Amino acid sequence: MINDVISPEFDENGRALRRIRSFVRRQGRLTKGQQLALDSYWPVMGVEYQAAPVDLNTLFGREAPIVLEIGFGMGTSLVTMAANNPQQNFLGIEVHSPGVGACLSSAHDAGLSNLRIMCHDAVEVLENMIPEASLDMVQLFFPDPWHKARHNKRRIVQTPFVELVKSKLKVGGVFHMATDWQPYAEHMLEVMSGVSGYLNLSEQNDYVPRPDSRPLTKFELRGQRLGHGVWDLMFERKE
C-alpha cells in the first residue's frame, strides 16, 4: 500500500501550498492482525490513488450501482452494508491505516467481492479519480465535528465540498450524512439547503429517520441508552 494520504501541491514558484483539511493524520499503531490484512488483502481490495479518472466498472469487474463511503472508521458498518447488498458496489475511503487494516480483515472474513478500499484524502479522490455523475450514493457518517468555533472551517461539509459531491452523483443519486452533534447537524442542513440542485428527502425539510440501510453502531447504541441524539440527512441530486 502506497501510504501517501495527501498529494503535495505547489504554487508557480514551487512553494508548498497548505490546504485546509477535515482530518488530522494520526499515526496509530497497527495490530498484527491489521498489518497482516494490509499485507494479504490490500492487493485484492485496495485501490491506489491516481490523479486521473478511474473506470469504476473495471475497478469492480462488473456494472452495478456504486456507493461511496467517506471516512469509514474501522469499517464495521461498511462491511455490513456491503454484505447486505451484494447487488451494489461499495468504495470506502479512510485516511487512518489501522481502520483500513481492520476493514480489510472484516471484508475478507465476510467473503466480500463487492468492496474496494482506499487510503487517501477523500476530497482529492473525488476531485481527480471519480468520474462525473457516476455515483448512486455518497455516505458520510459521523465525520469529525470540530467542536471549537475556530476549527469550524475544518468541517468537511462546506459549500465547495457538497458542490463537488453533487457533480459526482448521478441525477437521482443521494448524499446521506449522519452526525451525533446537533450543532454540526444544523450546520449540515444550512449548507445543504443553500446549494441548488439538491432535494431534501425529509418531509419536514430537515432530518430523516435513520434508514434501515445504515446499520446502528455500538457507539450509537450506547448513545441512545444515554439519551443522545443522532441526525440523518439525505439529499437527492435533482439536476
From Swiss-Prot:
It comes from the Bacteria. Its EC number is 2.1.1.33. It is an enzyme of class 2 (transferase). Keywords: Methyltransferase, S-adenosyl-L-methionine, Transferase, tRNA processing. One of its GO terms (molecular function) is tRNA (guanine(46)-N7)-methyltransferase activity. Residues 150-155 are annotated as: Interaction with RNA. Pathway: tRNA modification; N(7)-methylguanine-tRNA biosynthesis. The keyword Transport does not apply. S-adenosyl-L-methionine binds at E69, E94, D121, D144. Monomer. HAMAP family: tRNA_methyltr_TrmB. Belongs to the class I-like SAM-binding methyltransferase superfamily. TrmB family. PANTHER family: 3-DEOXY-D-MANNO-OCTULOSONIC-ACID TRANSFERASE/TRNA GUANINE-N 7 - -METHYLTRANSFERASE, PENTACOTRIPEPTIDE-REPEAT REGION OF PRORP DOMAIN-CONTAINING PROTEIN. This is tRNA (guanine-N(7)-)-methyltransferase. It comes from Yersinia pseudotuberculosis serotype O:1b (strain IP 31758). The gene is trmB.
